[in-house]
Swiss-Prot record:
Gene Ontology, cellular component aspect: extracellular region; host cell endoplasmic reticulum membrane; host cell Golgi membrane; membrane; viral envelope; virion membrane
Major location category of this protein: virion
Keyword rRNA processing among record annotations: no
Gene Ontology biological process: clathrin-dependent endocytosis of virus by host cell; virion attachment to host cell
Signal peptide: 1-28
Alphabetized InterPro entries for the sequence: Equi_arteri_GP2b
Cell location: Virion membrane; Host endoplasmic reticulum membrane; Host Golgi apparatus membrane; Secreted
Protein name: Glycoprotein 2b
Pfam families: EAV_GS
Extra remark beyond the main annotation: Translated from a subgenomic RNA (sgRNA2).
Keywords from the UniProt entry: Clathrin-mediated endocytosis of virus by host, Disulfide bond, Glycoprotein, Host endoplasmic reticulum, Host Golgi apparatus, Host membrane, Host-virus interaction, Membrane, Secreted, Signal, Transmembrane, Transmembrane helix, Viral attachment to host cell, Viral envelope protein, Viral penetration into host cytoplasm, Virion, Virus endocytosis by host, Virus entry into host cell
Spans traversing the lipid bilayer: 178-198
Physiological role: Minor envelope protein. Part of the glycoproteins heterotrimer GP2b-GP3-GP4 which is probably responsible for the attachment to target host cell. This attachment induces virion internalization predominantly through clathrin-dependent endocytosis.
Gene that this sequence comes from: GP2b
């Protein structure tokens, strides 16, 4: 009987491992796809040569965790590149700049500590560049990593081609990020409810096998009475 119960337990354990092994790669691929699509599309709209978004950012989470210090350098280099026009061709619209309202919006974001530290320095160092076309600054956290790698990679591999995203495109990225987060929550709920029957069935079978009421004191199952 112990051998039988162990074999049943091993059987359910193998089934659970099989379903987990088949679901986890799909879930991991879906997770990477959801987080990569916005960064990939952003690089396509920027049309940056000599750069593949998937090689630069495995996931959007990694892109946004690039670090406050690197982002601060990006802000300065972004404005400096717009001032010198080293990276941008002269036949396209100017690179969108930063306005004081941008910093007000960013003060409520996760970049607030470093933004407040660099605010006065940037405002005093690049006063003319702040008059460029303003962007939706709440989306700067999404655009900044792409611009940062675009600009610095151009210094290493040659000039890059810039096509600045429009305000409509930036609004699209914001809505897509909100949509993606809601889809992630919905998919997690669906996956949870899909796993509940399997886990419940394994638990019931395991408790039935390990229930002491089905065993006698000698460890054998009671025989049925023959009428």
């Amino acid at each position: 009987m112990q051998r039988f119960s162990f074999s049943c337990y091993l059987h359910w354990l193998l089934l659970l491992c099989f379903f987990s092994g088949s679901l986890l790669p799909s879930a991991a691929a879906w997770w990477r796809g959801v987080h990569e699509v916005r960064v990939t599309d952003l690089f396509k709209d920027l049309q940056c040569d000599n750069l593949r978004a998937k090689d630069a950012f495995p996931s959007l989470g990694y892109a946004l965790s690039i670090g406050q210090s690197r982002l601060s350098y990006m802000l300065q280099d972004w404005l400096l590149a717009a001032h010198r026009k080293e990276v941008m061709p002269s036949n396209i619209m100017p690179m969108p700049g930063l306005t004081p309202d941008c910093f007000d919006h960013l003060e409520s974001s996760s970049y607030a500590p470093f933004i407040n530290a660099y605010r006065q320095a940037i405002l005093s160092q690049y006063p003319q560049e702040l008059q460029l076309e303003a962007i939706n600054c709440k989306l700067l956290a999404v655009v900044a990593p792409a611009l940062y790698h675009n600009y610095h990679l151009a210094n290493l591999t040659g000039p890059a081609t810039w096509v600045v995203p429009t305000v409509g495109q930036l609004h699209y990225y914001a809505s897509s990020s909100i949509f993606a987060s809601s889809v992630e929550v919905l998919a997690a709920i669906i996956l949870l409810f899909a796993c509940i029957p399997l886990v419940t069935r394994v638990y019931i079978s395991f408790t039935r096998l390990m229930s002491p009421s089905r065993r006698t004191s000698s460890g054998t199952l009671p025989r049925r009475k023959i009428l």
